[in-house]
């Protein structure tokens, strides 16, 4: 199974940002942990991070043309307003999971709305970095 993991704006600063919201795990450790988990699950995991909306759209279009079995995406702040990322995700027929480290519905009002959620199959929010592992496990359980 081939899964694309996309992390959006500011996620490369995990470990430097507000630990009460995002925990203390840094980005490199998160990716290393997820790659190990994916290997145990016999999953081919490609990880991508960008602070640029267009780069994320380009990566999604590339993945569409190459073919992937599933997408896990944490768009960061793009969650709340990026119709470009939403539209790029919408063309996929594979499973798509939106992940958020913090509980976006218990934060500032502007964070409560996700324009991404309607084009995803599942939203995981508020489980910390464990949410990424839950997404991987779920995708393996539904046996794409």
Regions found by a protein language model. Name each.
Residues 1-4:
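Extreme N-terminal starter segment of soluble prokaryotic enzymes
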Residues 41, 92, 118-119:
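Short, structured coil segments at secondary-structure junctions
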């Amino acid at each position: 199974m081939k899964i694309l993991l996309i992390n959006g704006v500011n996620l490369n600063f995990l470990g430097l940002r507000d630990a009460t919201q995002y925990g203390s795990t840094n980005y490199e450790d998160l990716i290393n942990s997820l790659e190990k988990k994916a290997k145990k699950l016999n999953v081919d995991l490609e990880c991508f991070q960008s602070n640029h909306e267009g780069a994320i759209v380009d990566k999604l279009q590339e993945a569409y043309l190459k073919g992937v079995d599933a997408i896990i995406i944490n768009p960061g702040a793009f969650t709340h307003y990026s119709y470009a990322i939403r539209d790029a995700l919408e063309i996929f027929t594979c499973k798509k999971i939106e992940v958020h480290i913090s509980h976006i519905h218990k934060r500032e009002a502007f964070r409560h709305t996700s324009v991404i959620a309607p084009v995803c199959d599942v939203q995981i929010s508020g489980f910390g970095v464990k949410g990424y592992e839950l997404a991987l496990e779920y995708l393996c359980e539904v046996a794409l």
